[in-house]
Each structure stands twice: as C-alpha cells, then as structure tokens.
C-alpha cells in the first residue's frame, strides 16, 4: 500500500467518532433509555417531554447545553467532511467545550451516587466527542504545520 492510499489517522478518528455518535443514539444510556430518548429528556426544560419534571435552573441549563452539543457535533461533522474548517483553532475550542459540557452527566451521576446507572451508550456518546476533539486537535496541528512550514524541496 502506498502512502497516498493509506487512510490518515485523522480520517480514521473522524469516521470512528461518526460511527460512535450514530451508535450512541440507539444504545442504552440509562436503563430502558436509548440515546435518542435521553436527548429528548435533556431538552425537556425547553420542549416538555413525557414525564420529565421541572428542574432547577442549575440542572436545566447544563442539560439543555449538553443536548445542543449533539447539533454542534453534526455541524462539526459536516464542516470537516466538506473541508470547510476555516479556523481549526476554533474547531478545537468548540470540540473541547462540547466534551466538557457532556461530562456534566458523569459528574451528576457521581454526585448522586448513581454512576452504575450510566450505561454503555453514554460512554460511547462521550467517546464520540473525545474522538472529534482529537480530530480537531490533529487538524489544527496539520493546518499550523502546513501554513508555517516551508515546503520547497521537501518530500510530501
């Protein structure tokens, strides 16, 4: 296999992130709660859903922001796929913010002594965001390297 036909690490990480993200929507996040239902419950402070009760603002805000990271993930996916990331450093910051916001659920479960309630789907979902963060970091390094490194006389 030649160097041009082997997939780049960023491509592998990117497609792994996309696959993990997609799978997490169908995997159980909590007992009897697949990812897509957890998304709806997280948006319940804005758009009421089933039996989701009223929450204090200090729980409502991070839940809604965490739910919105799913939309951000899809936007980052589309931008990276289209190679339209004009500011790779901003891509890193946004991906990092998403990871940190999504850690809310882990911290909340730990605080309420309910870590055993978080199931495989949550960790796959979180891993998708961590993988996207790695893609963002590698892309930013590549952009920085190619924009500041002289290429005359060096092999590709």
Residue ranges and their predicted role:
Residues 2-150, 156:
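Compact integral membrane and secretory-pathway proteins
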């Amino acid at each position: 296999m030649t160097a041009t036909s082997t997939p780049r690490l960023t491509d592998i990480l990117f497609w792994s992130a996309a696959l993990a993200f997609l799978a997490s929507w169908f995997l159980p996040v909590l007992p009897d709660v697949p990812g897509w239902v957890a998304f709806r419950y997280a948006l319940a402070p804005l758009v009421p859903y089933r039996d989701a009760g009223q929450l204090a603002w200090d729980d409502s805000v991070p839940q809604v922001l965490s739910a919105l990271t799913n939309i951000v993930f899809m936007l980052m996916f589309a931008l990276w796929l289209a190679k339209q990331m004009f500011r790779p450093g901003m891509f890193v910051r946004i991906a990092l913010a998403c990871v940190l916001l999504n850690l809310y659920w882990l911290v909340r479960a730990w605080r309420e002594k309910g870590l055993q309630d978080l199931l495989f789907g949550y960790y796959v979902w979180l891993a998708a965001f961590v993988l996207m963060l790695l893609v963002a970091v590698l892309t930013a390094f590549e952009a920085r390297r190619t924009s500041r490194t002289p290429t005359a006389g060096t092999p590709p």
